[in-house]
Amino acid sequence: MDTLEKFLELRAFVNGIERRGLVYGASFSEFVIMRAIKQEGSAGIRRVDLADAVALSVSGVTRALAPLEKLGYVERLDEALDARVRRVGLSPSGAALYQDISENVQERMNQVSSEMQELLLSLTK
């Protein structure tokens, strides 16, 4: 498979995830943010750490979180040791949405070639 074919298959994969994600009410970018939050567990994650995890600026993360907060998928968590620190975590409905989209992504992964799976997995390391 040449580079152009790989790129087109990757783009089709992401477009498919994006379309299905929109059915659930979250874009692929929002899914990536939710994934980073989910990986931190119930303690949540500081916005600055979330920005590092998803390669956005802190203000970019703040803008991306706004619709997720408005829809009730993400909630602000208080920091026990320092009131100035703000963390965000997934709400129960956000965790359920994340699970639904994750299963959908896994289903899509099973439909792409093994070569594309290896490429996708290498991009997440």
Where are these regions (language model features)?
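Short, hydrophobic-biased segments on the C-terminal half of alpha helices
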Residues: 47, 65-66
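N-terminal leader segment of winged-helix/HTH proteins
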Residues: 1-24, 71-73
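Charged, amphipathic alpha-helical coiled-coil/dimerization segments
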Residues: 66-124
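N-terminal helix-turn-helix DNA-binding core of bacterial DNA-binding proteins
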Residues: 15-57
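A cross-family signal for key residues in well-ordered alpha-helices
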Residues: 8, 32-35, 99
